[in-house]
């Protein structure tokens, strides 16, 4: 069933990109709900590649952990669009390596003292980007290695640290998201 849905999605989306655009400005969908505002810029490069830089203002959004975070996140990713699915410009399936740095201060739950979290992560992600007229939708999932001084919550406004079934690992970073944007 999943294979059928993927094939149908690919067939429908093949004719959607009417023009080829080389630039996009995107906002991470629902980033405000997780406590930050994320804006990114993507530029098409030769040989089915693109480069993307994203910046995030931590604290410009809903404070879901009630710890008053304030800081920033920077990330760079380099997309490699897959040959068989590449449709030109900003559309198609891709894989990408990412480098992320997150730095912010927050109120610790136990002491309420301002505490600093500084984390970096190197991720491998895969996703699909679709353009329709001037609208771009980009969704991905990935994981990789994290390092630095983690926050109590394990959430670093660009990736989350492994916390499954009560097992924490401060060196495994996970990331997924959806971005919406404008092509030009």
Predicted regions and their residues:
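Cleavable N-terminal export/targeting peptides
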Residues: 1-20, 184
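Short loop/turn motifs that connect adjacent beta-strands in outer-membrane beta-barrel proteins
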Residues: 18-21, 48, 83-92, 131-137
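Outer-membrane beta-barrel "beta-signal"
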Residues: 75, 79-80, 170-184
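Membrane-embedded beta-strand positions of outer-membrane beta-barrel proteins
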Residues: 25-27, 41, 51-55, 76, ...
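Transmembrane beta-strands of outer-membrane beta-barrel pores
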Residues: 29-33, 55-61, 80, 99-105, ...
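Transmembrane beta-barrel architecture of outer-membrane proteins
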Residues: 22-24, 34-36, 71-75, 119-123, ...
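Structural signature of outer-membrane beta-barrel channels/translocons
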Residues: 42-44, 79-85, 127-131, 181-183
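Flexible, solvent-exposed loop segments that connect beta-strands
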Residues: 57-69, 101-120, 149-169
